[in-house]
UniProtKB/Swiss-Prot annotation:
Organism: Homo sapiens
Tissues in which the UniProt entry reports expression: Liver, ovary, peripheral blood leukocytes, testis, prostate, spleen, colon, lung, placenta and kidney.
Glycosylation sites noted in the Swiss-Prot or TrEMBL record: 261, 272, 435, 503, 526, 532
Outcome after substituting residue 130 to C: In MPS3B; does not yield active enzyme
Lineage start: Eukaryota, Metazoa, Chordata, Craniata, Vertebrata
Protein name: Alpha-N-acetylglucosaminidase
Amino acid sequence: MEAVAVAAAVGVLLLAGAGGAAGDEAREAAAVRALVARLLGPGPAADFSVSVERALAAKPGLDTYSLGGGGAARVRVRGSTGVAAAAGLHRYLRDFCGCHVAWSGSQLRLPRPLPAVPGELTEATPNRYRYYQNVCTQSYSFVWWDWARWEREIDWMALNGINLALAWSGQEAIWQRVYLALGLTQAEINEFFTGPAFLAWGRMGNLHTWDGPLPPSWHIKQLYLQHRVLDQMRSFGMTPVLPAFAGHVPEAVTRVFPQVNVTKMGSWGHFNCSYSCSFLLAPEDPIFPIIGSLFLRELIKEFGTDHIYGADTFNEMQPPSSEPSYLAAATTAVYEAMTAVDTEAVWLLQGWLFQHQPQFWGPAQIRAVLGAVPRGRLLVLDLFAESQPVYTRTASFQGQPFIWCMLHNFGGNHGLFGALEAVNGGPEAARLFPNSTMVGTGMAPEGISQNEVVYSLMAELGWRKDPVPDLAAWVTSFAARRYGVSHPDAGAAWRLLLRSVYNCSGEACRGHNRSPLVRRPSLQMNTSIWYNRSDVFEAWRLLLTSAPSLATSPAFRYDLLDLTRQAVQELVSLYYEEARSAYLSKELASLLRAGGVLAYELLPALDEVLASDSRFLLGSWLEQARAAAVSEAEADFYEQNSRYQLTLWGPEGNILDYANKQLAGLVANYYTPRWRLFLEALVDSVAQGIPFQQHQFDKNVFQLEQAFVLSKQRYPSQPRGDTVDLAKKIFLKYYPRWVAGSW
């Protein structure tokens, strides 16, 4: 591939979402000033001046910020866009003031006077885009959010330099208008949509119907929310990505148009065709462009556009044909439905399909898709590039621009995990790849509010031209900023975590918590890990040692709880291994001892310490869902949606425990009863001399799991107990056993 062709493709894309007029500069500057006031308060905000100047960018499309002043003068923050100015503000707060902004909270103690910036500090991003989100994030993390929570997230996005992000709320209301216009009945539409917690997979054609329908109030509230989200994103100069038609239609379309050419796709995620097996329009069917253009026209009429659209036709679904001609036609149909309405359309495609089913997506099939859209009009997300990059085996996506993304988290699971070395070096390697068409970096987790160190690093890399030279020094500074003070034991704890849980490498690294703690028990559970458990326990000890100095820091208390949770997760694996070994050896006394500690001491202790922090409460999680409702019946429905997603995921445990969380209440009333039932079954097996029957246990435990989902029990949404005291209590009981190797 010639470098000229690559440059031309990237050049076309750089036109998308390019900076606007002087009026936009003023609006973006005002948005950043408002952010400063929200973040720091009106008093400290007066010490900052903010301006947006397009001419500041050294090259078109490359965001640039400049910092100056401070000391006796106001701090000057200038940016080529609002996002650039916000990123510059964050740089000043982070590197000059030692502040920290994160999902779990912020540490914003400003030095007085404000530190002066030596001379003028100017920084330009090496790439056009810093992308954020995954289609699944909309369901695993955002689904129940109100405007206040969205406003905080958009502030976080701006501070971290995000300038390209999905904005997919409210689309079902638009689809409802389109389907009604096509002749579907309201009942048919209601039957098609999933419940709120599963909309991400309805939007990608994986599911329909499951745990629906959507109440009318849902559409109204989501439309309102989408308008506010879009207004706020655009006020910073971000480019929102709107949805487009990917080809999936309700079955009822075949009633209205009996001659329509559709293919019934295969099942997905162990669901049967009552909830899966979507209908995909043939690309040559004349109704394809009609539906696609109807939807996009109505969407743009409602929300406006920034000309980048997301659509995923074959997400985790095998296409009806592997013939390159079919795949090219299917791709062309989606793209032409966009350009029929918006001649400037750029298609944002999640590259997950190429990674997820490599046995289907051979070179010819990949070329067919990538070559069916003009170069520069398809923007591919290399979604899991930190672990399994696709650009390296597709010649940089055959010349189409791509964004190097860190996926990191699956299902919104809790669990300390990261591949920081791979993340640190990945973007530079992609930029230096022969004839690279990389145009950005991205964060694409399925769920957020976990492992914040990973996202701090990735956000920083979006503005760096090279990797962080010393990750150990970087993580030590991260801890000092996070807690507001440097502490040797806390820094040492973080360096141990860096070399252990945050040092996963190789293709086996998937950010999915498969710990026995959060899985349906069996005798075949995998307890293998990529790190030395000693590092986790020693980091735990060091963090507790620093508690007398750091316990007033909310971030420290959060991290201490999270590390205690991780230590208990390790202990559960160890006691499980002992119980399994005792069962296989038919040693009843050892089985009773190990199983008793696991199910009757360790798990209750975990639930108790989790209950000390509102961010680890099932009650808080479910209250979000209930608060989105306008009636008690709706609140019950939304809560059940949320319970299903956390546990069974489908009516029969179809994707069981995929979205597992470690929350107080969930541990006590879901994970603990499962473990007790399992261990009691093992004890009965040994005592009576009969084999343990996994299939019978699965039937029995499903009754417990389903009962939890259908339960109306309410859980506290306010924390109780002191995190430090409870963590110390667990530590003093189990750490000596770990050191002695006595279980």
